[in-house]
Amino acid sequence: MSFRPGARQFFERRGAPLPYDAEVEYLQNTGLTQFINTGIVPDTGFRVNARITPLDVSVGDKWLIGAWNSGARFYPMYMYPVGRWGGGYGGYFQGSTVAVAGTTIEMDVDYTASYQIIKIDGSVVQQFAKSGYSGTSARSVYLFGLNDGSNNVNSFLAQMGATKLWMNGSLVRDFIPVRFANTNNQSEGAMYDRVSGELFRNAGTGAFTIGPDKS
């Protein structure tokens, strides 16, 4: 049986232990070379909700979550221009809400049939018509970066907590950040998906900084 790169499959059985040692507050992309491949290819009807803390807001044209190819572009959590939260779909991008370093927010981005709606802490901050492209991205969404088919994830320094992904109203990923002991008996950070029962490990290089255990 083969497993998706970056994920380890555990079969949920009644009474079986969870495949991690503790849930933690966040993962941090130290060195900007770590990312999680969610395995979800977005299209219209895609939605993502994440608890995030930007640590470097002096950047622009950088991504925290996204997927791209020449046919369709999904930039749900995007720093554009410098120091502002933005989003984009296809050939249109918009940024207006100032990002504050060290401030934790809950960001929700919903791609409806005609609009991209961005909420921060429950309030709509951007809503604009999608234009330029349509259909699926053909590439799966990354957390902590943009999947453009290369190893350059074009991210910025941030912490990410619980993150959920929907497709057409159905919850397809329910990630919580966790730590577990790897085969070298070292503590490793990963995202555990409560929908599939999979542990999604770093698909890049280096290692995530692991936040404190969640109380």
For each feature predicted by the language model, list its residue ranges.
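Surface-exposed loop/edge segments in extracytoplasmic proteins
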Residues: 72-74, 91-95, 123-128, 170-174
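Extracellular glycan-recognition modules
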Residues: 19-86, 167-172
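Extracellular beta-strand elements of beta-rich domains used
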Residues: 163-165
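Short, aromatic/His-centered strand-loop micro-motif at the edge of beta-sheets
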Residues: 84-107
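Localized edge beta-strand/strand-to-loop motifs within extracellular or lumenal beta-rich domains
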Residues: 101-119, 168
